[in-house]
Design a protein with these regions (language model features):
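Compositionally biased terminal segments of proteins
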Residues: 1-196
């Protein structure tokens, strides 16, 4: 299917129309945007915002107000006004009936103009402008190396399939950056030989 006609991405665009801060499509949909086609079916769409912008998220998304979900267990609870959420353990989700695919908001750590990998103890970072790619119609999405930095620690078969499907689209600079990050955090990881 053509990425241009995706109802899911149109729903994200409409949902974030009034959101004044940075956001990115992440996960498998970001890879689809980079490849220019829908490569496989998706169960949901991940949208990442900066954790420092949580107050703006609360002001923008009020009807309906999203719920807090634990991505590991799927358990949901109401999001209390003023409650702070950290990168990693929580996501915000909207009622499934509102969109073609469930949309979840994930949080990224940052430091001034840099994105910070929250699993890397602050040592893995990249300028926000470098991690931001845009579709032909302007939809922001994470660069490949950022998507795979999160996917490589999951060990899921769909993540391995995603990697095999788009690894040849990497340019050398992004490839080397990802290699260095994986080698630093997980020196025995199975994707490393692909880079060598």
């Amino acid at each position: 299917m053509s990425i241009d006609r995706s109802e899911t991405l149109s729903a994200v665009r409409a949902l974030f129309h009034d959101y004044p801060c940075r956001y990115w499509i992440a996960g498998g949909w970001a890879l689809d945007l980079f490849a220019g086609r829908v490569r496989r079916q998706h169960g949901d769409v991940d949208v990442v915002v900066l954790a420092r912008d949580l107050d703006e998220v609360a002001r923008t998304f009020t009807r309906p107000r999203p719920a807090v979900q634990n991505p590991e267990t799927g358990e949901c609870r109401p999001w209390a006004p003023g409650e702070q959420l950290a990168p990693g353990p929580n996501a915000l989700v909207f009622p499934d009936s509102l969109h073609p695919h469930p949309i979840q908001i994930l949080f990224a750590a940052s430091d001034a103009g840099e994105w910070v990998y929250h699993r890397g103890r602050g040592t893995i970072r990249k300028p926000l402008d470098e991690i931001t790619l845009r579709s032909p119609d302007g939809l922001p999405y994470f660069a490949l190396e950022i998507v795979f930095l999160f996917k490589f620690c999951g060990g899921r078969s769909k993540d391995n399939d995603d990697f095999a499907d788009v690894v040849e689209l990497f340019d050398s600079e992004r490839c080397c950056w990802l290699f260095d990050c994986i080698a630093l955090c997980y020196p025995e990881y199975s994707w490393l030989p692909v880079f060598c």
